From Swiss-Prot:
Superkingdom of origin organism: Eukaryota
Matching InterPro entries: OGFOD3, Oxoglu/Fe-dep_dioxygenase_dom, Pro_4_hyd_alph, Pro_4_hyd_alph_FE2OG_OXY
Region spans: Disordered: 1-32
Membrane topology designation: Single-pass type II membrane protein
Topological domain spans for side Cytoplasmic: 1-41
Major localization listed first in the record, in broad terms: membrane
Keyword Iron: yes
Class of enzymatic activity (EC top level): oxidoreductase
List of residues binding Fe cation: H226, D228, H284
Protein name from the UniProt record: 2-oxoglutarate and iron-dependent oxygenase domain-containing protein 3
Residues on Lumenal side: 63-315
Residues that, per the record, bind 2-oxoglutarate: R294
Sequence intervals crossing the membrane: 42-62
Length: 315
């Protein structure tokens, strides 16, 4: 019998071949995992960048429907005035020749009230508001009527605190208040070409302190658009004296004149006076305060002596 031909004996598979196949298999499995990890890193980076951008945007108090800043915080304006057509709001009220607005507009100046005066009158606001304060984000102090925010309500600080008021405020405080009111009144009269003696202080004229605390009542919702002549029928000329600085003391909280397609905004600066006619030609709102505390005083004037109020007196 012829011998059977056999091939070379089968050698058992060595560890090296098995390891090569295992390595190839592992490498194939690893590729999708690495791609997934790379993708996740890209997504995480994108989210981080978006978050940083949002935080920077928010901290600056940017409002995306504001088209133009007419008064930057860093500017020191001798005077800037923008004339706009008067609305018909004044027609529904008794007119006073030589005072009722025929020239309408808005102005800003940084040279009427000094920063030192603004700091001094802010301390008056701080002393008064230390007696109370709203549970929400907006607190009011009215030295004329005595109205003070306390919790979710208002009290008359003169009746509520009685003789203690003499230890909180001084006659110098009230004299400074009167001096500043007079300076603002003269500024408005000059800008609109009317006699200052025809303007009467009217209510409400008040300090405001706004922070980012969530609103608790309708009185805390200061950010809604409104017209002063509609909200307060006595107003003919409105002014605001800012007592703190945008982006230093607070974020958000800018003043926005609302116009179709091109809003105009004023950035608060301590000592800055913003003033305007009170009709619908100056529809406006205040941005929500996002951080910090914003102080200001609203000083309103009327042409109707029947709606006039006296300067506050410390008695």
């Amino acid at each position: 019998m012829a011998p059977q031909r056999r091939g070379p004996p089968r050698v058992p598979e060595g560890n090296s071949a098995a390891e090569r196949r295992h390595a190839n298999s592992t490498k194939k499995d690893r590729l999708p995992q690495e791609a997934q990890r790379t993708w996740l890193r890209i997504v995480a980076l994108g989210v981080s960048l978006a978050l940083v951008t949002f935080l920077l945007w928010s901290s600056a108090g940017i409002d995306d429907d504001v088209a133009e800043v007419v008064a930057h915080r860093g500017e020191v304006l001798e005077g800037r005035f923008i004339e706009v057509p008067c609305s018909e709001d004044y027609d529904g009220h008794r007119r006073f020749e030589g005072c009722t607005p025929r020239k309408c507009g808005r102005g800003v100046t940084d040279i009427v009230i000094t920063r030192e005066e603004a700091e001094q009158i802010r301390r008056i606001a701080e002393k008064g508001l230390s007696l109370g304060g709203s549970d929400g984000g907006a607190s009011i102090l009215d030295l004329h009527s005595g109205a003070l925010s306390v919790g979710k309500h208002f009290v008359n600080l003169y009746r509520y605190f009685g003789d203690k008021i003499q230890t909180i405020f001084s006659e110098e405080d009230f004299q400074l208040y009167r001096d500043i009111r007079q300076k603002v009144q003269l500024t408005i009269a000059e800008a609109f070409g009317i006699r200052a003696s025809l303007l009467y202080l009217t209510k409400p004229t008040f300090f405001s302190r706004i922070n980012s605390t969530e609103a608790q009542t309708a009185h805390d919702e200061y950010w809604h658009a409104h017209v002063d002549k509609v909200t307060y029928g006595s107003f003919d000329y409105t002014s605001l004296l800012y007592l703190s600085d945008y982006l230093e003391d607070f974020g958000g909280g800018r003043f926005v004149f609302m116009e179709e397609g091109s809003n105009k905004t004023v950035e608060p600066r301590a000592g800055r006076v913003s003033f305007f006619t009170s009709g619908s030609e100056n529809l406006h709102r205040v941005e929500k305060v996002l951080w910090g505390t914003r102080y200001a005083i609203t000083i309103a004037f009327t042409c109707n002596p029947d709606h006039g109020i006296e300067d506050p007196v410390l008695t």
